[in-house]
Amino acid sequence: MNAMEFFQRSAGKWRSQRTTHHLAFRQAEIGHSDIEVINLDAKDPKILEICKMHEIDPSLAAGGAFVTWDGSMAWDKDDENHKGSTVFAIVPDSENPRSGRMLRERGYAEIIPVVGRFEMDDEDGLNLITEYETMSSIERFWFTSPNLRMRSSAVKRFGGFNTSTFCTEVRLVESNSDSQTETPHVDLEYYSAFGW
């Protein structure tokens, strides 16, 4: 699987449950969000625009995604919100389409346009590595089934304030009877850290 195929598999609406560990404070915070992923082909105006923004030849882009989210975290103050959108564009390396540049309209750790690296690992997980001016982030996304996606991230800020996050994301499906969104049944396999 390449990164564009991963985005195609991610298309749709998701409900995310998140736990963020604030390592400096030795505390964890929970939250949730609703996420929608819309695939964009290489000729989509949003892909052309983000390539232009980052001064990358648009003919090198394989496509990408438009992602929106709306969520909350337990420690939110009244004026805080976790709502937004961003465009991702995939620019694969010519010698290996499973790695390359990931153009973002808005970064994960800082709200600025940024170019990071992506790599598909041996388990078809999508790894994103991004260096910002004041911090760096590593994110990994992977599927355990077609309707269950996992995400982990580590953000290292200069000055030692680090966070680590783990999310489970369940695909939402439209109910045929009354156009309501429902969470599909997910068959889970349980594993022990001890091997039994």
From Swiss-Prot:
UniProt keyword list: Lyase
UniProt GO MF annotations: lyase activity
InterPro entries assigned to the protein according to its UniProt record, in alphabetical order: Calycin, CpcS/CpeS
Broad class of enzyme this protein falls into: lyase
EC number: 4.-.-.-
Signal peptide segment: none
Summary of the function given for this chain in its UniProt record: Covalently attaches a chromophore to Cys residue(s) of phycobiliproteins.
Similarity comment text for this entry: Belongs to the CpcS/CpeS biliprotein lyase family.
Matching HAMAP family: Chrphore_lyase_CpxS (MF_01459)
Protein name from the UniProt record: Chromophore lyase CpcS/CpeS 2
Name of encoding gene: cpcS2
